[in-house]
Amino acid sequence: MTLIWRHLLRPLCLVTPAPRILEMRPFLNLGASWTSVTKLSLHTKPRMPPCDFMPERYQSLGYNRVLEIHKEHLSPVVTAYFQKPLLLHQGHMEWLFDAEGNRYLDFFSGIVTVSVGHCHPKVNAVAQKQLGRLWHTSTVFFHPPMHEYAEKLAALLPEPLKVIFLVNSGSEANELAMLMARAHSNNIDIISFRGAYHGCSPYTLGLTNIGTYKMELPGGTGCQPTMCPDVFRGPWGGSHCRDSPVQTIRKCSCAPDCCQAKDQYIEQFKDTLSTSVAKSIAGFFAEPIQGVNGVVQYPKGFLKEAFELVRARGGVCIADEVQTGFGRLGSHFRGFQTHDVLPDIVTMAKGIGNGFPMAAVVTTPEIAKSLVKRLQHFNTFGGNPMACAIGSAVLEVIKEENLQENSQEVGTYMLLQFAKLRDEFEIVGDVRGKGLMIGIEMVQDKISRRPLPREEVNQIHEDCKHMGLLVGRGSIFSQTFRIAPSMCITKPEVDFAVEVFRSALTQHMERRAK
């Protein structure tokens, strides 16, 4: 594994000699009420790996003014992590810097979005060059970046997935995929898993099956949930179910080529087809690994059988690759490939543009024709020159810097290290995932698997932040830490993250004992 340009900048050093975690920068004036982070005892301060990047001096709004503007003018739905939300100022690769100059290791990458690193120099250079040439035109005119990108993206997908619709977000992509499925099948019913997140637009809210995203009013007509085949929290699961270096602590007596949990969940899927939808359906949406629900993996072989059942009912199979694509899972470039399936439609977003608004729907010529016969689909910003130039640069960086291989190597290493914490701490119920998409589920105890109360998970989350590590949250009760760093992450940085978690968990157990 090589990360070419980074090796030129950082030849040595795993840790700084005597770091001061989250050192305050007194030259920044953010108002008298801004206070230092919580002080931690000496034994809880893992050493942060070095970073040779110096952030610019912060010269914008004071922290208190930011809070006022947020309260007065921004949607109240826009909530932030932590009791004292971070005011982030600048990013460099896997690092983020706040307005006080404090440095954080970003292990959530903008909700699984910054794929090749914050402000990657090659991506930045391409964006700046395109910015000076052509920002926006329209798809009623041709421009090279769109066609160059389409050719590159199509080359990374198997036949017959070769027709590309460019849009701007995952919700847009999934809504278009819903429209395609219904236009092609002449049916209405679409199935998705409980715990699924496929967007927050009026139509995709029907596919999303998480209580906090549901309204009392009707929405997403024709969408039906089915049981999520969760081998840790669901009724069935064993010790060989997942395509992961780390399995659940649940035991089973399955032979190597057999999975009783998979068979039981398939029976539940058949039950949904028999009782909850029409004889002919439009389609089935599935994330290769559920993201927002806490990195939930299905039993091996489940999706393959489910796809066959859906097609037997006249439906199309849609893989939501918004979080799992572009090499993040390590073993394959596309998440659906890890299940040995070929979808009829693939949606992608987030990592496709490394944080620049961009998304795509890829399908077969036959399904694409079914849509255009029904309507003239148009998207003002979809396929704009800036997005396409950046998208091409992201694909080039993934290949040139072997980031898929890095995801496999470093991700497997990280999973095995976090699994040691599961064995060490009673409140770590499960460690799961593949490549650089990892979930750490917190429980009250391993036997009951009851979720650790939110306020306790919040404190562990705060402690990680105080030590310089940023991670995400997921699952129905927000009890799972979501780990999804940029694919440029290194093993020394993983070692730091594991030690931060160990320290935060130790502090939690000490608080419990008092």
Curated annotation (Swiss-Prot):
Identify residues that carry N6-acetyllysine. Answer: K71, K84, K262, K420
State any GO BP term from the record. L-alanine catabolic process, by transamination
Function, in words: Multifunctional aminotransferase with a broad substrate specificity. Catalyzes the conversion of glyoxylate to glycine using alanine as the amino donor. Catalyzes metabolism of not L- but the D-isomer of D-beta-aminoisobutyric acid to generate 2-methyl-3-oxopropanoate and alanine. Catalyzes the transfer of the amino group from beta-alanine to pyruvate to yield L-alanine and 3-oxopropanoate. Can metabolize NG-monomethyl-L-arginine (NMMA), asymmetric NG,NG-dimethyl-L-arginine (ADMA) and symmetric NG,N'G-dimethyl-L-arginine (SDMA).
Which EC number(s) does UniProt give? 2.6.1.44, 2.6.1.40, 2.6.1.18
Per UniProt, subunit arrangement is: Homotetramer.
Give the subcellular location. Answer: Mitochondrion
What name appears for this protein in its UniProt entry?
Answer: Alanine--glyoxylate aminotransferase 2, mitochondrial
Range annotated as the organelle transit peptide? 1-41
Q: Does the keyword Ribosomal protein apply?
A: no
Q: Which InterPro entries match?
A: Aminotrans_3, Aminotrans_3_PPA_site, PyrdxlP-dep_Trfase, PyrdxlP-dep_Trfase_major, PyrdxlP-dep_Trfase_small
CC annotations in GO: mitochondrial matrix; mitochondrion
Where is the organism placed in the taxonomic lineage, from the top?
Eukaryota, Metazoa, Chordata, Craniata, Vertebrata
Keywords from the UniProt entry: Acetylation, Aminotransferase, Mitochondrion, Pyridoxal phosphate, Transferase, Transit peptide
User: Could you say which enzyme class this protein belongs to?
Assistant: transferase
Residues that the record marks as modified (N6-(pyridoxal phosphate)lysine) are K350
- Catalyzed reactions per annotation: glyoxylate + L-alanine = glycine + pyruvate; (R)-3-amino-2-methylpropanoate + pyruvate = 2-methyl-3-oxopropanoate + L-alanine; 3-oxopropanoate + L-alanine = beta-alanine + pyruvate; 2-oxobutanoate + L-alanine = (2S)-2-aminobutanoate + pyruvate
Q: Which domain of life is it from?
A: Eukaryota
Q: Which cofactor does it need?
A: pyridoxal 5'-phosphate
Modified sites of kind N6-succinyllysine: K71, K262, K304, K420
Q: What is its main location?
A: mitochondrion
The family line of this record is: Belongs to the class-III pyridoxal-phosphate-dependent aminotransferase family.
Q: Which Pfam families match?
A: Aminotran_3
Provide a Gene Ontology MF annotation, just one. beta-alanine:pyruvate transaminase activity
Question: Do you know which PANTHER family this protein is assigned to?
Answer: ALANINE--GLYOXYLATE AMINOTRANSFERASE 2, MITOCHONDRIAL, PTHR45688
